[in-house]
């Protein structure tokens, strides 16, 4: 049920984990490659990228390398290159409030409005690195529709060759929203899946699978 397992990586594919540190998802993606193909694990934070590198080395993911670049730089270097892309986006962390009250202070400084803008930039840049017919998985650990369904709606407007594809359901998964207050989102956002902490053990998450058109 992890985000990495939902991406269904196959041996021999080229895979990007765009916001990868500290490496839990990256190591799972790397293991799925079974030593074949390529994993690029990126994090914009230098200290976190070093931790990411250590974890990949500890897990013996030899067909990987770590980058420490903003997404737009990677997008310039790897246009239409990857079969699979993981975007576990930086977010306001509302789903972590119960686990870590200190996140509330960070949220007051940089809330959903700040991260929504950042996510909209990241997801389009990520889409530009996806091969035709490839798959991208977007996830956050926050409740805000601004950081979830609004981000997906923005992607679908900017890259109309992309579509949201259904994923296997689990009990207590909730559909994504198609509207919030006075704002409407793309109808396909109902294919997104929300995990609520009062319905399932753990933190709040949103999962979305985006597939590039074969075009």
Segments the model singles out, each with a brief description of its role:
Residues 149-169:
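Conserved Class I S-adenosyl-L-methionine
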